[in-house]
């Protein structure tokens, strides 16, 4: 029996190659010479004669396209967010108001074990007074320190990371013979 394929055996047992018809290799579009030829062949195959065009119905297709595009169009509004406050925090006004609150609230107070409770009341009063200035989009941190005078030294330090253009802080101090009250107000602008 004879095998079919490229390599066929002869009756004597020797193999020989059967003649394979060689096809021409397709030109590659990456070769500069054959690229123009490929384009010409593709363009030749893509030309068609238009024999008949159906007339449009009552509603024109062009009108439908216009309606569809107008439905996609959205109104554009300007951005509503602000990058800066309407009214900048004015430290000198807040400082005078806090000084007045401390002076009025602490004129007859002696230092005792109720000082922590008094610190909370002062902080709430200062926060309410600062909010009356109506600084839009500002957040406030109020810290009131009640320190008894016993001949000691004290260092108070604060650190922060903020925007130096809009954020600020205020300190107010009220001092008597038996205690010192330090009120700190931090005003932070939130965009």
UniProtKB/Swiss-Prot annotation:
Q: Which disease appears in this protein's record?
A: Could be involved in transmission ratio distortion (trd) in mouse t-haplotype which causes male sterility.
Q: Where is this region: Disordered?
A: 1-29
Expressed, tissue-wise, as follows:
Expressed in testis (at protein level). Expressed at the pachyten stage of the first meiotic division and in later haploid spermatogenic stages.
Membrane topology of this protein: Peripheral membrane protein
Q: Polar residues composition bias: which ranges?
A: 11-20
Q: Can you say what this protein is called?
A: Dynein light chain Tctex-type protein 2
Q: Which organism is it from?
A: Mus musculus
Indicate the impact reported for residue 48 to R: In T-haplotype
The UniProt similarity line reads: Belongs to the dynein light chain Tctex-type family.
Q: Keyword annotations for this protein?
A: Cytoplasm, Cytoskeleton, Disease variant, Dynein, Membrane, Microtubule, Motor protein, Transport
Subunit-level organization: Interacts with CCDC159. Interacts with CSNK2B.
Its job? May be an accessory component of axonemal dynein and cytoplasmic dynein 1. Candidate for involvement in male sterility.
Q: Which domain of life is it from?
A: Eukaryota
Quick one: a GO biological-process term for this protein? microtubule-based movement
Is Iron among this UniProt entry's keywords?
Answer: no
């Amino acid at each position: 029996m004879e095998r079919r394929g490229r390599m066929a055996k002869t009756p004597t047992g020797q193999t020989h190659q059967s003649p394979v018809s060689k096809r021409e290799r397709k030109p590659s579009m990456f070769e500069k010479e054959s690229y123009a030829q490929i384009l010409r062949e593709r363009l030749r195959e893509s030309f068609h004669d238009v024999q008949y065009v159906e007339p449009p119905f009552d509603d024109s297709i062009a009108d439908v396209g216009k309606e569809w595009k107008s439905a996609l169009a959205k109104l554009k509004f300007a951005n509503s967010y602000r990058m800066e406050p309407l009214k900048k925090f004015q430290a000198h006004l807040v400082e005078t108001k806090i000084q007045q609150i401390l002076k009025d609230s602490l004129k007859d107070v002696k230092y005792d074990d109720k000082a922590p409770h008094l610190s909370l009341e002062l902080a709430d009063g200062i926060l309410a007074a600062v909010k009356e200035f109506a600084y839009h989009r500002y957040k406030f941190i109020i810290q009131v320190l009640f320190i008894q005078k016993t001949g000691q030294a004290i260092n108070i330090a604060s650190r922060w990371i903020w925007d130096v253009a809009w954020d600020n802080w205020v300190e107010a101090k009220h001092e008597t013979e038996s205690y010192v009250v330090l009120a700190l107000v931090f005003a932070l602008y939130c965009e």
